[in-house]
Amino acid sequence: KINPSVSPGMEAIINKSLVYNPGERFLSAAAMKEVLIALQRGQAVAVQPATPAISGGSVTSILPGQIAPPVGATSTLSIQSAPTGQETGLLTSTYFGITPLWVFRCEDEIRSQPLPVGKFVYVSVYDNNLYALSRADGKFAWKYASEGGFAASPVHEGGNVYIGSEDGKLYALTGETGRPLWSYQTGESVRCTARVAQGHIFVGSDDRFLHAISMHGGKRAWTYETPAPIRSRPYVLDKEARVFFGCEAGEFFCLDFGGNMKWRHRSKRAITSSPNFVDGLVIFGSADYNVYALEASSGWTVWKQRTGKPVVSSPAVSEKAAYIGSADGNLYALDLRSGKILWKFETGDQIASSPAIYKNAIYFGSVDGFVYCIEMKDGKLRWKFKTEGAVISSPTVVDDVVYIGSTDHNLYALTA
């Protein structure tokens, strides 16, 4: 039943906090509190889209008793309508005058990392589909529908694509046509991106197990049980025959290729971040606000660096530094040997996107709706591109093109 005592101003605030697109909600609890206090005092309430339009948003003031406009009504950005799952009209950002090479619009949010291989770019979407698009112009090639959305990103090996789904399955498809080869059922959603090595696929599931699966036929080789869901993508060292990954209970594991634990490390909170490896170090982030560097052979902590909020972003590494985002809105450059902060770059909101390094630049997205390109040496901004939603997707940069998705339902191809 409708509660007549709820004012239009309160209704507008509640609607904004519950809107489907995270980028259109309040930027923080503090921002929502400020508006609620103003409403209580009978002041004008400013409800502003959390991600202003490319050509500039405006603030809508709602006085007590007034009716709020629909969320996003102040946006002046127009995206050409296109048939579902086809390329849209090109958008030009007023920030640095950037025009995408092409844009492909899907039916739901894109939170995964696009995978350009050969003539295709593959992207998994919450509309339950894995898409294959032309890298040249973004034209639709094929799509494969699962029974659940895709939070995991696709991987490609031997001409085939492998991807986990919310329906609990890992799918193997032909890369050329999307024809299904086999599927492997786990006990819960698969939000972990798989890793292919030594003829096997290593993938975590919300059923708390790491699964080792044969590439040929999808038969189980072994499983390893952990205390919590696994969403951290495994890192595999072929020569040492080691598999590294974290779980949501805050534990980080090193297994051999037979599924036997060699060592484990405990952090204080969940490890969603996927590890990277460089010079004998395994580096990853944790929800306990820290970035860790562990000795790969023993699990001994070489260093840890605290950020301002949880770290779900995964690190990119160079010869001298590790680069990783934090929910405090900063991208950090950390010295590989000491963990010392070399520099940090501040964005307008949380960073869940994992950075990519390409030609002395770093590319990543932020919940503030921007795709950023910054200098690797000092963190200076080169350019930024505005989307109409939070950018949780991680970029892939190949042949001078940045492929990245947004919660605005679009996949963007940008010139690097």
Could you describe each region identified by the protein language model?
Residues 66-69, 77-111, 115-191, 195-416:
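Extracytoplasmic/lumenal domain signature
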Residues 1-45:
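C-terminal lobe helix-coil module of Hanks-type protein kinase domains
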Residues 15, 20, 36-37, 44-47, ...:
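Short amphipathic alpha-helical "recognition" segments used for binding
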Residues 18, 57-58, 255, 414:
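Short, surface-exposed, charge-dense and proline/glycine-enriched linear segments
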Residues 27-77:
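Juxtacatalytic C-terminal regulatory tail of Ser/Thr protein kinases
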